[in-house]
């Protein structure tokens, strides 16, 4: 069975058992009345069952309802169908004030019907010939308004300075100021020029997201013809059907696939209604993607440390134990489905490097947008600065030093032999993004 953990907030006067049973029925075989066609099938075989209810600590009106769904209810290899069944209709149910899907346990038999990520972590490292450290990325800013040529120049400078990847922003598709084909051509030129100068393999996440699946595939095919290593997709706005289609193409044609989670906070930000990001992350691993943005723990975008580490494990590890402190309600066996690299991004800069290296480990992409392009001397020195800081942190960690306690000292020591790093440390020494969370609903 597929197991689901729902956070249920019943209407006043509705007992939790009734609310849990209603969720199970409405998201499987139930309807609002008895129908004569019920007699034509074996409902006992197909109906969802609420098998356990427990209170949420500290919340009088909320309960966790555990529901089991028979596997026969789901089409093989279709995340779209899985979500349509489990969360398609039940969230507007009048007996509930609010409902949140906290976690899913995907059984081994169902996992094996999915191809998963096009390549996975190890194959990506082999393709790029980069080992023993996190990968470095940068989103090109300003995200909208640059011409294709000026955009390509920014890409070249960042890659030449020492980054592994640069990135289209999620909303860069094919706008009047920069059509997709021009951007792809100038970015490919930047990649090849930077590779020739540095001797390293470089990439730029070319955003293939489009208004139709046909246009999306046309862009992916053009990227492959240019010989670039990676394309990108906005998987929530683009949809799971489009994402799985693109992932299959990428595996068959040797392209890596970077996934952006634009729109996720619409679904996952409220604490008592919607769907937790760990469910969206599991779904992405099944649908297919080699990288996905996972929050930063530090920086400007929200991400609580333990919870973030919980879905970083879900993305990368093969077997994940149930750990309630990390919000993981079920053990999950991925049966060797390839892993996904978590991408840390959002308001991070050089002083965050020790914390990011410690928290995310080697199998991650650290993405500094403003933290690269905001360098007072320009893009290439910004990239140099990030690469120097990363190498210093990785070396210190490998020597057994404590990055949590000695992080600032490690960065300061590296400043002595990197003027680019020293200049940036001076600029960003005081910047913090510390706001109280407003969404306490």
Swiss-Prot record:
RuBisCO catalyzes two reactions: the carboxylation of D-ribulose 1,5-bisphosphate, the primary event in carbon dioxide fixation, as well as the oxidative fragmentation of the pentose substrate in the photorespiration process. Both reactions occur simultaneously and in competition at the same active site. GO terms for cellular component: chloroplast. The disulfide bond which can form in the large chain dimeric partners within the hexadecamer appears to be associated with oxidative stress and protein turnover. It is an enzyme of class 4 (lyase). PROSITE patterns: RUBISCO_LARGE. It comes from Symphoricarpos albus. Substrate binds at residues 89, 139, 143, 261, 293, 345. Gene3D superfamilies: Ribulose bisphosphate carboxylase, large subunit, C-terminal domain (3.20.20.110), RuBisCO large subunit, N-terminal domain (3.30.70.150). The modification N6-carboxylysine is found at residue 167. Keywords: Calvin cycle, Carbon dioxide fixation, Chloroplast, Disulfide bond, Lyase, Magnesium, Metal-binding, Monooxygenase, Oxidoreductase, Photorespiration, Photosynthesis, Plastid. Signal peptide: none annotated. CDD domains: RuBisCO_large_I. GO terms for molecular function: magnesium ion binding; monooxygenase activity; ribulose-bisphosphate carboxylase activity. It catalyses: 2 (2R)-3-phosphoglycerate + 2 H(+) = D-ribulose 1,5-bisphosphate + CO2 + H2O; D-ribulose 1,5-bisphosphate + O2 = 2-phosphoglycolate + (2R)-3-phosphoglycerate + 2 H(+). Binds 1 Mg(2+) ion per subunit. Its EC number is 4.1.1.39. This is Ribulose bisphosphate carboxylase large chain. The keyword Lyase applies. SUPFAM superfamilies: RuBisCo, C-terminal domain, RuBisCO, large subunit, small (N-terminal) domain. Its cofactor is Mg(2+). One of its GO terms (biological process) is photorespiration. The basic functional RuBisCO is composed of a large chain homodimer in a 'head-to-tail' conformation. In form I RuBisCO this homodimer is arranged in a barrel-like tetramer with the small subunits forming a tetrameric 'cap' on each end of the 'barrel'. The record marks 300 as: Transition state stabilizer. Belongs to the RuBisCO large chain family. Type I subfamily. It is found in: Plastid, Chloroplast. InterPro entries: RuBisCO, RuBisCo_large_chain_AS, RuBisCO_lsu_C, RuBisCO_lsu_C_sf, RuBisCO_lsu_fd_N, RuBisCO_lsu_N_sf, RuBisCO_lsuI. It comes from the Eukaryota.
């Amino acid at each position: 069975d597929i197991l689901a953990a729902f956070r249920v907030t019943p209407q006043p006067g509705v007992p939790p058992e009734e609310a849990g049973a209603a969720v199970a029925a409405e998201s499987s075989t139930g309807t609002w009345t008895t129908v004569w066609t019920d007699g034509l099938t074996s409902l006992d075989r197909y109906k969802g069952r609420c098998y356990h209810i427990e209170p949420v600590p500290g919340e009088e009106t909320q309960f966790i309802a555990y529901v089991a769904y028979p596997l026969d209810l789901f089409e093989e290899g279709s995340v779209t169908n899985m979500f349509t069944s489990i969360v398609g209709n039940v969230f507007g149910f009048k007996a509930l004030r609010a409902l949140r899907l906290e976690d899913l346990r995907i059984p081994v038999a169902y996992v094996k019907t999915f191809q998963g990520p096009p390549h996975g972590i190890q194959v990506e490292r082999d393709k790029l010939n980069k080992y023993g450290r996190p990968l470095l990325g940068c989103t090109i800013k300003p995200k909208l308004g640059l011409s294709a040529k000026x955009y390509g120049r920014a890409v070249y400078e960042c890659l030449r300075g020492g980054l592994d990847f640069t990135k289209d922003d999620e909303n860069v598709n094919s706008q009047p100021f920069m059509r997709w084909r021009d951007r792809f051509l100038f970015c490919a030129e930047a990649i090849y020029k930077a590779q020739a100068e540095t001797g390293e393999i470089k990439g730029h996440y070319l955003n293939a997201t489009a208004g139709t699946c046909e246009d999306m595939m046309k862009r992916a095919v053009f990227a492959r013809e240019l010989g670039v290593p990676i394309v990108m997709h906005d998987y929530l706005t683009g949809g799971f059907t489009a994402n799985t289609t693109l992932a299959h193409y990428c595996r068959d044609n040797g392209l890596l696939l970077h996934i952006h989670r634009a729109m996720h906070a619409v679904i996952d930000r409220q604490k008592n209604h919607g769907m937790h990001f760990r469910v969206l992350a599991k779904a992405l691993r099944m649908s297919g993607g080699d990288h996905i943005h996972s929050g930063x723990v530090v920086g400007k975008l929200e991400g609580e440390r333990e919870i973030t580490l919980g879905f970083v494990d879900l993305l990368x590890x093969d077997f994940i134990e149930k750990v309630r402190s990390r919000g993981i309600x079920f053990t999950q066996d991925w049966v060797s489905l390839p892993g996904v690299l978590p991408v840390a991004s959002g308001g991070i800069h050089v002083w965050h490097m020790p914390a990011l290296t410690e928290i995310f480990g080697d199998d991650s992409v650290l993405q500094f947008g403003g933290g690269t392009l905001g360098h007072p001397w320009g893009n290439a020195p910004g990239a140099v600065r990030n690469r120097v800081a990363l190498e210093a942190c990785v070396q210190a960690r490998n020597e057994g030093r404590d990055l949590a306690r000695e992080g600032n000292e490690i960065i300061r020591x590296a400043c002595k032999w990197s003027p680019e790093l020293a200049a940036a440390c001076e600029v960003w020494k005081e910047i913090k993004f510390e706001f109280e969370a407003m969404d306490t609903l």
